[in-house]
Amino acid sequence: REEYPDRIMNTFSVVPSPKVSDTVVEPYNATLSVHQLVENTDETYCIDNEALYDICFRTLKLTTPTYGDLNHLVSATMSGVTTCLRFPGQLNADLRKLAVNMVPFPRLHFFMPGFAPLTSRGSQQYRALTVPELTQQMFDAKNMMAACDPRHGRYLTVAAIFRGRMSMKEVDEQMLNVQNKNSSYFVEWIPNNVKTAVCDIPPRGLKMSATFIGNSTAIQELFKRISEQFTAMFRRKAFLHWYTGEGMDEMEFTEAESNMNDLVSEYQQYQDATAEEEGEFDEEEEGDEEAA
């Protein structure tokens, strides 16, 4: 960060899940990581093993998903996010543009990615999808790569990246359509908070696809889940000696925990915010930052 202050720091961070757990101390590692990510990155795509598993089970009907299958989903999403950098398109967006459009408050830069159409590794889709189908699938909770239900929160901002040959007019109509039908799920104090980019070149094996990036307050569910697991272990100081033995301090854990809980309450605060109260919020925010 010191060396390259003007670079956009972008991470794809895998959030642990109890369903597919390699190590017992995942909640510790995740919490300590979030503590760093909140301060040091510009955009973080939260990819959740739990959600990836659910997608493999439910949507792709895989009975025993391997890491290969999970990675297939992750790579589809990552490729979608960086499409605009790599290919020519009508409406191009780079990472900086994404960051500018997606992050209304510097700490709240944890996005849930989604992808449509979801295909398993072997079977590429045989039928061409229409733009309405893509849009509908893209906003579907089952397609989110983070195990949170967007219906439990509100979108601060959304970016959609469509790939393939399609009519721009249709894309715009569909995106407006989604916003009008579900207006309660988009915060009203950020107008036009859905950005669309279209790129001509679809991913291999598909005619068209869409990548979804949502900055939703529902992502707090994910942090709450980790926080609960963290607290359960930290209360009893379980496994702490592995960390303290490496020269870490218990204080760091406490700080990381409270930082993550602050993040959750910040998301909640903006979820409940309405346009009228906006003035009050600005003052509170400034006070908070000075205190921090």
UniProtKB/Swiss-Prot annotation:
Membrane keyword on record: no
Region of interest (Disordered), ranges: 265-292
InterPro entries: Beta_tubulin, Tub_FtsZ_C, Tubulin, Tubulin/FtsZ-like_C, Tubulin/FtsZ_2-layer-sand-dom, Tubulin/FtsZ_GTPase_sf, Tubulin_C, Tubulin_FtsZ_GTPase
Gene3D superfamilies given in the database record: Helix hairpin bin, Tubulin/FtsZ, C-terminal domain, Tubulin/FtsZ, GTPase domain
Major subcellular site: cytoplasm
Gene Ontology terms describing biological process: microtubule-based process
Signal peptide feature range: none
Extent of Acidic residues compositional bias: 274-292
Family assignment from sequence similarity: Belongs to the tubulin family.
Function per UniProt: Tubulin is the major constituent of microtubules, a cylinder consisting of laterally associated linear protofilaments composed of alpha- and beta-tubulin heterodimers. Microtubules grow by the addition of GTP-tubulin dimers to the microtubule end, where a stabilizing cap forms. Below the cap, tubulin dimers are in GDP-bound state, owing to GTPase activity of alpha-tubulin.
The protein, known as: Tubulin beta chain
Source organism: Strongylocentrotus purpuratus (Purple sea urchin)
